Amino acid sequence: MILVDWQIEDRIRRGHIRVDPFEPGLIQPNSLDIRLGSHFVWYVPGETVIDPYDSETVCRDTEEMVADSIVLAPGRFLLAETLEAIELPDDIVASIEGKSSIARLGVELHQTGGWIDAGFRGTITLEMCNVNSRPVKVYAGMPIGQLVFYRTDRAARPYNMKQDAKYMDQQQATLSRYHENARRAEE
């Protein structure tokens, strides 16, 4: 079941869902608007192949900055953080969606990482890309996406109880940690 506005507000006020900082005016009929943070990370263009199982290539040739705004050039991909940190209980999951007004500028908010498991705690890393033919400027603090909350049965092993919860407690835009997976698939 998708939570509606009064359910979202009630669960946040009771501490069942934690959102910091919380602005009641960001609650929509079926979602909570989230804002862009100020930490950005991107790959420097080059020929180095990124191997998801090799942390050295994942972390090599990146730049990062903290800024009040950033210009996304056409085709530019970067990671950003949400201003809000969240904490989900073991019976609530969330999905992140871009705001249509931002999408209409050509800015995608996430590539495929739009699911937030029950038990997650931290900021959300956004996988942003400008598919417009023109540069687009985005600002820290601007509403950039929406969280949709779903009530589920209680998870037996919520994200915060998993031994391999790679992104638990992240507090800024975080590069892929795929290399922490137990084994490489057989080639």
Curated annotation (Swiss-Prot):
EC class (word): hydrolase
Active site (catalytic residues): E127 (proton donor/acceptor)
In terms of SUPFAM superfamilies, this protein maps to: dUTPase-like
Site (Important for bifunctional activity): which residue positions? G114, W115
User: Gene3D superfamilies from the entry?
Assistant: 2.70.40.10
Q: Which residues bind dCTP?
A: K99, S100, S101, I102, A103, R104, D117, T125, L126, E127, Q146, Y159, K166, Q170
Could you tell me which InterPro entries the record lists for this protein? dCTP_deaminase, dUTPase-like_sf, dUTPase_trimeric
Write out the catalysed reaction: dCTP + 2 H2O = dUMP + NH4(+) + diphosphate
- Its domain of life reads Archaea
Provide this UniProt record's keywords sorted from A to Z: Hydrolase, Nucleotide metabolism, Nucleotide-binding
Q: Name one GO molecular function term.
A: dCTP deaminase (dUMP-forming) activity
Any one Gene Ontology BP term? dUMP biosynthetic process
**Pfam families named in the record:** DCD (PF22769)
Enzyme Commission number(s) from the entry: 3.5.4.30
Could you tell me which pathway this protein works in? Pyrimidine metabolism; dUMP biosynthesis; dUMP from dCTP: step 1/1
Q: Which family does it belong to?
A: Belongs to the dCTP deaminase family.
Q: How does it assemble?
A: Homotrimer.
Q: What NCBIfam families does the record point to?
A: dCTP_deam
Outline what the protein does.
Bifunctional enzyme that catalyzes both the deamination of dCTP to dUTP and the hydrolysis of dUTP to dUMP without releasing the toxic dUTP intermediate.
- The molecule here is called dCTP deaminase, dUMP-forming
Organism expressing this protein natively:
Methanoculleus marisnigri (strain ATCC 35101 / DSM 1498 / JR1)
From the UniProt record, report the name of the gene that encodes this protein: dcd
